[in-house]
Amino acid sequence: MFSKILVANRGEVALRVMRAAKELGVKTVAVYSTEDADTYPVRYADEAVCIGPAQANQSYLVMSNIIAAAKTTGAEAVHPGYGFLAENAAFARACADNDLVFIGPSPDCIERMGDKSMARETMKACGVPTVPGSDGCIDTASEAKAFADTVGYPVLIKATAGGGGKGMREVHDPTDLESQYQAARTEAGAAFGNDGVYLEKLVLRPRHVEVQVLADDFGNSIALCERDCSVQRRHQKLIEEAPSPALDEELRRAMGVAAIKAVRAVDYRNAGTIEFLLDERGHFYFMEMNTRVQVEHPVTEQITGTDIIKEQLRIASGEPISCASRAPFVPFGHAMEFRINAEDPAHGFRPCPGTITKFEPPAGPGVRVESYVRTGSRISPYYDSLVAKLVVYGQDRDEALARGRRALDEFVIEGIATTISFHRRVLDNAVFCAGEATTDFIETQMGDVL
């Protein structure tokens, strides 16, 4: 095991990694911008190094500053968290070039799975189901039209790089295709520095179901059950749960087998997630692979009894997965995660940075809160709006729902608007409570908050 690691991130995920490292006896180095100098993760770490001003492109995205901080402090490895440089192959290579272990997959894997069209072709080749789509990038609007005319509308235009809903457009009417194609390319280029896009047949009213995977250097590749992330707004997840209420044991096993097939096809190492679309007939299709730890990993931890961050550290340090002998995993209980963002649902989820004048998280049986804030903390306008992740666990889904209602009612955050009230409304919605939410849930069931 490492003796010291650097955490190349901020906020909630930085603290999560540091806590896991501390339990393993590993010292931690925080990097921070001037904007984050007074945040709790900076104080929590054994050492901290300022890497630049508030703007991420002058601090958290500056590879050379992060590498220098790791070398100066004697860190042996770098954990990228999620976001920022977590899925940047050049950063993973820079770590290796400087004798630092990147706590994640190889640069080649990041590159191969980060190119969405290449990933799709790889999955097709190894027998993982995929949605009918274009062969590689679509370079012109006329090519896009030819593909759409062949498979039929609606179609989905997707960026080959990145994720989070950027560079993605649904097209239901042929007259909108050219404008949406150009808009997707423009957005993708601005967000990822790569304006490449490809097209897929749009699966209507699907569920978003993903499988958490771990793989080590000893031939162990395991699936840690699935998560249902269907409650989304503009392709951004808001609520996640595990296991999915839509899966029976046969379908769970089939998705797990497909996920392991995907992992082995690219010789993957460390933690990753295979995302699938699940249609109304129970057919599933590969969507993409996330080559990092996910925001929503705690719900998987709750139903499997694993610590995914610790497993990442073990794998990267050359140890085998500690829970490999327990595979195949059968979920026990039910967990849900609610992303508490500094956004105002009453005004179109407008960002609401500012100072938190009161922060009183819920507690009690089956309640877990992952957050880096305290009363007096300031939510910066420069970064992601995530304030906290509320995770609840129950013996079954009904208990998890009841616990979620109770915990949301107890959660007090004052000084800024948050999504707490939105989540509370979702838990009173009959469709969600019945476990029938699909990716259009917010548009069809919560339209008044859009």
Language-model region placement:
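ATP-binding N-terminal substructure of ATP-dependent carboxylate-amine bond-forming enzymes
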Residues: 1-126, 138-146
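ATP-dependent carboxylate activation and anion-phosphoryl transfer catalytic cores
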Residues: 7-26, 48-50, 71-73, 89, ...
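A generic structural signal for short coil/turn motifs at secondary-structure boundaries
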Residues: 57-58, 110, 167, 297-299
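Conserved beta3 strand of the protein kinase N-lobe
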Residues: 133-134
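Active-site neighborhoods of enzyme catalytic cores
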Residues: 154
